[in-house]
């Protein structure tokens, strides 16, 4: 979805992956193992592998591992450039909208350039549930660099000092088509305190996804049902609606999961 949305408007996709989760568990190198599926995008992808073993052995702080993943990814993947460039950093599920990037690329940018923080339209489980207390998620950073500039290692952490740009990206959290992927995320991500049996229960997960309930019982967190036909969607989701129906409608008895 991300590659389709941005392919015509970016110079290079820098993608970092590791064979360990942030909590230190073995995982597949998904992009490497499925490389042929993305053949049409190969000429604009630079993939690097991050060795998290030293980081994981060094500390029990899973957030340190997450920072290492981001920082090492930028350090290893960023090519030598002979001219100024814009660097966008984000998680995989934070997708800039193509028309914003198209506009940004056509602009005469001021020097010095004030870094941007793209505020994503924030959805949960599918594009049918909008995060109600916080409809925007502070995700993508946009920074400008010259060839001799040293790239800071805290672009993600310092993003709240950037200029906010609202509704310029998508963030669809837990928009998975397999229930086992939900369980895998719970077992793998940095919030290890949430990895408890209740949140792995199949009936519980399906109920949350079908009815827009918070998976983790967090106080004040709720989701608002929205009309899919009245919102903006990523381009590939628009043209392949049947393929991505789980991102559009979770009301079926299996909540759109292909493995249930």
Q: What are these model-derived regions, one by one?
A:
Residues 18-89, 98-102, 232-258:
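Active-site-proximal specificity loops/subdomain of glycosyltransferases
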Residues 94-200:
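Conserved catalytic core of nucleotide-sugar-dependent glycosyltransferases
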Residues 10, 82-84, 113, 166:
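A general structural motif
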Residues 11-15:
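Hydrophobic targeting segments
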Residues 6-9, 39-41, 109-110:
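Short, conserved loop/helix-junction motifs that constitute active-site signature segments
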Residues 1, 71, 75-77, 81, ...:
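Catalytic phosphate/metal-binding cores of nucleic-acid and nucleotide-processing enzymes, i.e., regions
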Residues 164-260:
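C-terminal accessory extensions appended to soluble enzyme cores
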Residues 1-5, 100-103:
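A short acidic, amphipathic alpha-helical/loop segment
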């Amino acid at each position: 979805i991300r590659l389709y949305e941005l392919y015509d408007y970016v110079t290079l996709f820098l993608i970092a992956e590791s064979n360990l989760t942030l909590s230190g568990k073995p995982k597949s190198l998904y992009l490497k193992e499925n490389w042929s599926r993305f053949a049409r995008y190969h000429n604009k992808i630079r993939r690097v592998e991050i060795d998290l073993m030293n980081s994981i052995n060094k500390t029990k702080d899973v957030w340190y591992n997450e920072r290492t993943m981001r920082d090492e990814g930028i350090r290893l993947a960023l090519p030598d450039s002979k001219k100024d460039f814009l660097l966008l950093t984000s998680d995989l599920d934070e997708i800039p909208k193509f028309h914003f990037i198209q506009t940004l690329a056509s602009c005469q940018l001021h020097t010095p350039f004030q870094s941007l923080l793209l505020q994503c339209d924030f959805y949960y489980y599918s594009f049918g549930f909008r995060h109600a207390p916080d409809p925007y998620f502070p995700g993508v950073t946009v920074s400008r660099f010259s060839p001799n500039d040293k790239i800071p290692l805290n672009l993600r952490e310092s993003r709240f000092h950037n200029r906010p740009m609202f509704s310029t990206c998508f963030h669809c959290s837990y928009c998975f088509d397999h229930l086992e992927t939900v369980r895998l995320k719970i077992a793998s991500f940095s919030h290890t305190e949430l990895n408890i049996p209740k949140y792995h229960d199949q009936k519980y997960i399906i109920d949350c996804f079908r009815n827009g309930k918070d998976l983790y019982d967090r106080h004040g967190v709720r989701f608002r049902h929205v009309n899919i036909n009245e919102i903006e969607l990523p381009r590939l989701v628009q043209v392949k609606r049947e393929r991505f129906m789980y991102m559009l409608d979770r009301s079926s008895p299996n909540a759109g999961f292909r493995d249930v």
